[in-house]
Structures are given as structure tokens and as C-alpha cells.
Amino acid sequence: MHRVCFDIRLKNFGHGFWWVAYLDDVAVAFAGLHASVQWERTGYLARAGVHPAARVHGLQRRLIRVRIAKARRLGWQWLVTDTVENPTSSNNLIECGFRAFEPAKPWATKAAAYWRLKL
């Protein structure tokens, strides 16, 4: 699924929580969530993607909301994430309540936009 959505090598995301959305027994979207390595009681929205043929149906927003709900059940206070040159993902995050911020210690590329949500 990752290779279909992204033209980059997959990091080892063997920890945290993962969701996969299916349509007719075919995986069409995925998303991850794990604890932040920088902040306590904070989660990180890890890699997420939607198959090109399954886009424009709100799957990414649904997967963002599922991860927000899981973070709340875990008792986390914040969620953070980043996007790189991806206005669709940025807009979906904004629609789900995330706001842009500048972390003291950026963790992604120079082109990244950083997002956080107070839970």
C-alpha cells in the first residue's frame, strides 16, 4: 500500500497503531499513530496514504479522526504531524482541527509544514 501511495522508501514503522481501509477486500488507504519521541503525552500521526483510485471520498479525513479518537483514549494531550508539499493533506488536517506551528526542534525536511492539535 505504501508503494502505491508514495514514491519513497518506507521507514521501519513496526511500532504504534495502524489502520487499513478496504474496499471490496482490497486495501485502499492506511494510516499510523505512535507516541512522540520528543514530547510526553503526545502522539505523532505517522505515514498515511490513500490509493489514487480511492481519493476524493474523505478517507484521509476519516483516518485522521480515527487516530484523534485513539489518542484521546490513550490520554494523550497533543497530536503532532508534518506534511511536505501536500496541500490536500494540509487542508484535511486543518478541517480536523490541526493548526500550523513551528517546533523548537524540527524533525522533518526543510520543506515540511508542522501541525498540532490540542486534545
Question: Which functions belong to the PLM regions below?
Answer:
Residues 16, 110-114:
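Short hydrophobic/aromatic beta-strand or adjacent loop that forms the aromatic wall/cage
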Residues 84-103, 107-110:
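Conserved active-site alpha-helix within GNAT-family acetyltransferase domains
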Residues 1-41, 46, 51:
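Acetyl-CoA-dependent GNAT
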Residues 116-119:
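Short beta-strand-to-coil "C-cap" segments at the C-terminal boundary of structured domains/repeats
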Residues 32, 80, 101-102:
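A short linear hydrophobic-aromatic micro-motif
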Residues 50, 56-69, 95:
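Conserved acetyl-CoA-binding loop-helix of GNAT-fold acetyltransferases
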Residues 35, 52, 83, 105:
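Residues that line or immediately flank small-molecule/substrate-binding pockets and catalytic motifs
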Residues 71-84:
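Conserved GNAT acetyl-CoA-binding A-motif
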